Design a protein with these regions (language model features):
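Conserved GNAT-fold acetyl-CoA-binding loop/helix
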Residues: 25-45
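Conserved beta-hairpin
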Residues: 54-68
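Conserved N-terminal entry element of GNAT/NAT acetyltransferase domains
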Residues: 1-15
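Conserved acetyl-CoA-binding loop-helix of GNAT-fold acetyltransferases
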Residues: 99, 105-118, 141-145
Length: 168
């Protein structure tokens, strides 16, 4: 059994999720990654996730230690992929994943992706897609280790992202 549990985020999680995102911004900056350094994501983005029922938290030892948006509504910018998706199947999307620094290197991000895969399977969805910055090698390694395949690039918020897909 994994040391992490997952649940749908509630309004009560907004401040904690926002703090995790802010902590992740600092971590990325300190590690030379330009991703999330322009103000986004912010509390408003997370509040939108919660309103749409797409926000999820990861708990460890009774504390919220991770946040991600897991959506099944599609991602419009993925329609303009420069490259090729593995499939044309309906898909889940993981956005805005942030893991508390205390859980980094302990399998938290892979566990969150496995949780997202389970949510997909519950909905009879057999594809999951993710995008990240080209300089975020940490996330790219996590994705590769979890069986995601590089598919090309997309433009998101006026920034080019690299896109991955995994068939499940």
């Amino acid at each position: 059994m994994e040391p992490f549990t997952f649940r749908k985020a509630t309004e009560k999680d907004l401040q904690t999720a926002t703090a995790l995102i802010e902590q992740a911004k600092v971590f990325l900056r300190e590690n030379g990654v330009d991703q999330w350094q322009t103000g986004y994501p912010n509390e408003g983005a997370i509040a939108g996730d919660l309103q749409r029922g797409e926000g999820y938290v990861m708990e460890a030892e009774g504390q919220v230690r991770g946040y991600a948006c897991i959506s099944f509504a599609g991602e419009p910018c993925y329609n303009d992929l420069e490259g090729n998706w593995l499939s044309d199947l309906p898909y889940g999307v993981v956005h805005r994943m942030a893991i508390d620094n205390s859980c980094k290197g302990k399998g938290a991000a892979p566990a969150f992706f496995r949780f997202a895969e389970e949510l997909c399977k519950e909905r009879d969805i057999h594809s999951i897609r993710v995008d990240t910055d080209g300089d975020n090698r940490m996330m790219q390694r996590v994705l590769e280790k979890q069986g995601f395949t590089y598919c090309g690039t997309v433009c998101f918020d006026n920034s080019e992202k690299i896109a991955f897909e995994k068939l499940i």
